[in-house]
């Protein structure tokens, strides 16, 4: 008996991986499914590209108001293929938003939000909100003029909310004005809170799809 077969048998005995493999590879695909049903999967691919390129940029990015812009400039001009990594990150971000919008339209037009898939739709809407938050927080990280004023405007929007508005503004900014605490918060959101939140909701989304299957034609 070969070593590879022994290893496989060891895992099979404990995890029954063959049953998992059979379930994944034998899932029924309805005949009405076409290329537009791939938009959600493309959105996932864009997210994975975002994760990989974003992780690479954390080796060079410095989340301080005095060094953020210069660290991005250094990445673009001095790091080997740094310009490509950041460009792919930006392009895939735009592609992710576009694919998400098209995916939402496809699901809505084909009635994929109806019973019994309401919770699948809800998790999708939550992921759409998280994706928008990704864009807002990522836009500010270079800390150039565009990023600074974008943060100032966006973080000031909750001020219009009665009672808790001022508290939310101070929570986002880390104080009364935009500064280092604001950049730190946005960096933390963009690189830790939002990615893991999106990953959790993606897992829930996919498990529901696996359980309920793809919605039928109208």
From Swiss-Prot:
GO terms for biological process: photosynthesis; respiratory electron transport chain. The chain crosses the membrane at residues 35-55, 93-113, 119-139, 189-209. GO terms for cellular component: plasma membrane-derived thylakoid membrane. Heme b 2 binds at residues 89, 190. It is found in: Cellular thylakoid membrane. Heme b 1 binds at residues 103, 205. Binds 2 heme b groups non-covalently with two histidine residues as axial ligands. The keyword Iron applies. Keywords: Electron transport, Heme, Iron, Membrane, Metal-binding, Photosynthesis, Thylakoid, Transmembrane, Transmembrane helix, Transport. InterPro entries: Cyt_b/b6_N, Cyt_B6_PetB, Cytb/b6-like_sf, Cytochrome_b_N_euk/bac, Di-haem_cyt_TM. One of its GO terms (molecular function) is oxidoreductase activity. NCBIfam families: PRK03735.1. Belongs to the cytochrome b family. PetB subfamily. This is Cytochrome b6. The lineage of its organism: Bacteria, Bacillati, Cyanobacteriota, Cyanophyceae, Synechococcales.
